[in-house]
């Protein structure tokens, strides 16, 4: 049974998405939580990996559960019966704790043919910068890059607008069979 997982995380204390021995990663944390629920190891496939310190909202992954794992999901619905696939997110949140830095916001049976990596049709990235003119908001310290000088908003906006449109980034990619898209279409920039 393929399950789609919608994920959010604060990457501040993670060493990126991809599971690595001895390092705390988003994938390792979430897979361990689900493995505890289904009683055996699982492996997530994600729409796009992130680096250390990168946050995500709306990240999508999928996991394939075998018959025994799915049976454990179905047989442990608790007092409030609900869709077994939807219960995975709730149960993972329970394992992860009250205020986790990674969570599954939604889980559902994936539609036929769904693959988190290859079914993704768009991504949104947000980069936050603050300069010395505005001061630094301590509540944004984990998601905003502080620049000691003064940023030229107009120059940055002009440069960012050159990215709008369709561009081929094949020259920046390692040749790999699994990579089928090297084009990027930027739709907007915001100052």
Provide a role label for each language-model segment.
Residues 1-188:
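Structured-RNA-binding interfaces characteristic of tRNA pseudouridine synthases
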């Amino acid at each position: 049974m393929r399950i789609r997982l919608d994920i959010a995380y604060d990457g501040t204390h993670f060493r990126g998405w991809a599971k690595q021995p001895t390092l705390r990663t988003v994938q390792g944390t979430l897979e361990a939580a689900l493995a505890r629920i289904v009683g055996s190891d699982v492996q997530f496939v994600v729409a796009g990996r992130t680096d250390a310190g990168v946050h995500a909202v709306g990240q999508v992954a999928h996991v394939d559960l075998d018959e025994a794992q799915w049976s454990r999901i179905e047989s442990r619905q608790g007092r409030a019966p609900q869709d077994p696939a939807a219960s995975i997110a709730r149960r993972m949140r329970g394992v992860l704790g009250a205020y986790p830095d990674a969570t599954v916001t939604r889980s559902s049976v994936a539609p036929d043919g769904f693959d988190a990596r290859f079914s993704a049709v768009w991504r949104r990235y947000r980069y936050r910068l603050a300069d010395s003119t505005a001061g630094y908001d301590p509540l944004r310290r984990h998601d905003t890059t502080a620049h000691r000088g003064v940023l030229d908003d107009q120059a940055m906006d002009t440069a960012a607008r050159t990215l709008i449109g369709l561009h081929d980034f094949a020259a920046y990619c390692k040749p790999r069979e699994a990579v089928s898209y090297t084009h990027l279409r930027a739709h907007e920039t915001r100052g």
